[in-house]
Amino acid sequence: MKIRAVQIDIARQMETLDYIKHFIDFTSSSGYNTLVLYLEGRIRTNTFPFMAENESYTPEEMKEVVDYADRKKMDVIPVVSNFAHTEQFLCFKETVRFGELREGRTGRFGNNISTVCPSKEETYEFFENYYREIADIFPSPYFHIGNDEVWDIGFCSLCRNRIKEGETEADIFVKHLKRTYNIVAGKLGKKMMMWDDMFEYYPEALEKIPRDIIMCCWHYDTFIDIPKTHFGNRKRFDPLATYDKLGFKYLIAPREIHPENVITLTEYALNYKPLGGLLTIWEKGTDFMLEDYPNIAFAGKLWERSTVDNPDDLYKGVCKKIFGLTNSAFLDLLFSIKYYGRWHINKFLRGPLTPCEHIRMKLVAFFEKQIKPFEKKVKGSIGKEIFRDILLRLRIERLHLNMRSFFSSICKYISGRKEIHPDILISEGTRILQEIDIVKGIRSAQWKRFRPGIFPVKTDTLYTEIYREIEGILKEIQSGRILRRGVFYIRYFLPDPYGSQKVRIAIKYKGEKKWNDLYSGIPKPDIDDPSQIPYYTFTHFVSGFKVPEKILFQTYGYGGIGITFLEIVNKKGHFIPARTDRTSGKVSNPDALLIDDTRWTYLGEINTVRMYQDHKKGEEIHSIEISLSRV
């Protein structure tokens, strides 16, 4: 492939210049010829001088990075979005006036002020000046304008007036792209790149924009034959065929987490004429990139040879070079670990332990036991550092699964579904707290080494929060207060796990007139757990000594959400749905949730695209009130 690019996200998590240079050393020797810097507003300039010195880079510092990359024969492309993902620009009193939600309106997915208004002339004046300053730093022929996930088009009074006068959101998007193109291509003489996901919502826009805009086609599903849309109904479609037909050039953009994502997206792309590949790496605030270096090197080498033949052998060859070992058992083991993927540690209160998690617990223990003996055999300082980070990732995975198991045991203990002595739970919780302390210490040491002087220390924040959560639960077990709780189980049907339906659950107890709020938020499943799809169980605590009489379930937002069953277990008994009392809004098959089977009650619109295109539909509340009875 002509362009073999790798992106580092220094907008969400700053890195030191030394680390960026180290990353350039590694990637330039791994087949890459381009470094993409995801910046947002991280560079402090005359136009945008508001970022604190310790939270931003100077133009001179970035020029130092560009010069270093040039010596390694790597081009450096900046990414500065001028539509969505502009929160770094909009968080200052001098610039907040550029925001689309500046008048206090709520956007599609909340009040996050991250989108600029495309109807204000000063928006373009600001970005033209800032883009000119950024372009002076980066001599690359390319300039990436972001423009992904622009959820809030048409919300401010100026934009609403344009829509009232006959323009569509797609028209506004097209005019914005043309204005930006006139700046980037017309005035700065750069080739404009952009993310392509918004054309899933506004497909008619593609035929109205300049054909020399380069599309960056990002897809992160582990296995891809034909890509799916990112949010709207996850429709299967063929974007590269469309780009070839219309005459656009494009890059494919997988993510670093899983090699199979890189392989299958590349395999799909090689049926067409990609300009290259861009491996995206996003925020690493609570971890580091080291553990992903084998995946990163693999993608670079894969694109360097432009074929997906024998990817397993290529991956093992990359690992031979990194770790200096040719032992086949080691290479097979490392290959299995990296293909195994990873989960995030901050979802341990989500629901009961799943079948997939049970299996992963066994696998993690096996991986740790088998790979640990190779630690002293790994050669080279970089190889040793990467190996230690992989070991740490396995340890964190084990910690996460132990916390998940701990929470599941607590729910069984409270509900009486399993006889567990509290001393066993106390012992398990104490071991988890000790392990959290150890992991936090290791991460803190890594931070001091790789990110000296960069604050806040997000790893400390994460593990401190988790420690306090576990510690609080442990104190309840020790005092016996945990038995004052009951357990509420709700099983969702979520055909689109990327949906964003906001949910409110309230409970009314016998003899009480007031609804008690139980949960408010978006029930996001772990999309990497195939043992649940599309049914996901979530758990909440309720009163242990009151008789639950009714459940109120409300939802609003873009799309819909299904419920297959719900139940409560506490000291007063086991309670399940008896009847549906009333519904409002759009509720399909309201009686389906009365029986614990595969059917579902659906609240909202199953066509998320239709709701996305109508602001008012996203504000509609859909609700169902359910009476409970004791089994």
Predicted regions, residues:
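Substrate-binding groove of N-acetylhexosamine-processing glycoside hydrolases
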Residues: K21, D25, E64-D67, K73, ...
